[in-house]
Design a protein with these regions (language model features):
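Terminal, membrane-proximal amphipathic helices
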Residues: 1-75, 101-231
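Conserved phosphate/anionic-ligand binding catalytic regions in large, soluble enzymes, centered on
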Residues: 73-93, 190-194
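Structural signature of FAD isoalloxazine-binding scaffolds in flavoprotein oxidoreductases
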Residues: 93-102
């Protein structure tokens, strides 16, 4: 059954022009932003200026991004724009962008360099969520946790490739599950339209909680309020 699902996901991904490299492009967009679509650094620093505390900024960002994922407005307003930039199906792109930006913002506020390729691999690993990451580590497909990868001695391009492929496969499974859920929910009045948003909200909450566990603060306790500007 697993092989059949994998084959089906590959066919769907091919038909939709989706490759694992799309998640690298999406992460770049989530970090840097584009026009009115703010990137992780900007969102994080804006909240840090407002709250004057890194952890308070993280709490606010977490709640904001969970709400964005659980609503339908972001996908409606930005899904087509994201599709034009990263060739990911609009319904997948909106949720993945929100999750990538939230995780990157958490890493930024915890003192990680977002231009470091090790950190970017770790962000993609965090986007797999706790269950996805644990399953791949147990199977030997991933050597360690996102926390260890972010601070590894050197960048491992083969690991980065494996992580992005795993994220692609998981995302295709996720989309398939949402489609089934929406199909079934259409049989129930007043429910069908919100099922996909509920799934995205739940998965985003799980990913954000996992990211907070993995990206342990690298700031001294006495560091105080500092705006981090990366080159």
């Amino acid at each position: 059954m697993s092989n059949a699902n994998d084959a089906n996901n590959k066919m769907v991904a091919t038909a939709e022009g989706l490759t694992s490299d799309a998640f690298h492009r999406l992460l770049e967009l989530a970090i840097t932003g584009r026009g009115k679509l703010l990137g992780a650094r900007t969102v994080a620093n804006n909240q840090l200026r407002h709250h004057h505390d890194h952890e308070a900024a993280i709490r606010w960002l977490s709640n904001q991004h969970i709400a964005l994922a659980g609503g339908q407005g972001f996908a409606t307003n930005w899904g087509g724009f994201l599709l034009s930039l990263v060739t990911i199906p609009a319904n997948m792109a909106a949720a993945a962008f929100i999750q990538a930006r939230a995780v990157a913002a958490i890493a930024h506020l915890r003192g990680y360099e977002l231009d470091d390729p090790r950190v970017r691999t770790a962000i993609l690993m965090a986007m797999l969520g706790p269950r996805g990451s644990a399953a791949l580590i147990a199977a030997g497909d991933l050597p360690s946790s996102a926390a260890a990868v972010a601070t590894a001695p050197a960048f491992d391009p083969r690991l980065d490739s494996r992580v992005s492929r795993a994220l692609l496969e998981q995302s295709m499974n996720h989309v398939g599950g949402k489609r089934l859920g929406v199909f079934l929910a259409k049989k129930i009045p007043l429910v069908g339209g919100g099922v996909g948003a509920v799934v995205d909200g739940w998965s985003t909450r799980s990913i954000i909680q996992y990211a907070q566990e993995q990206f342990i603060s690298r700031r001294p306790r006495s560091a105080g309020y500092v705006i981090i500007m990366e080159s």
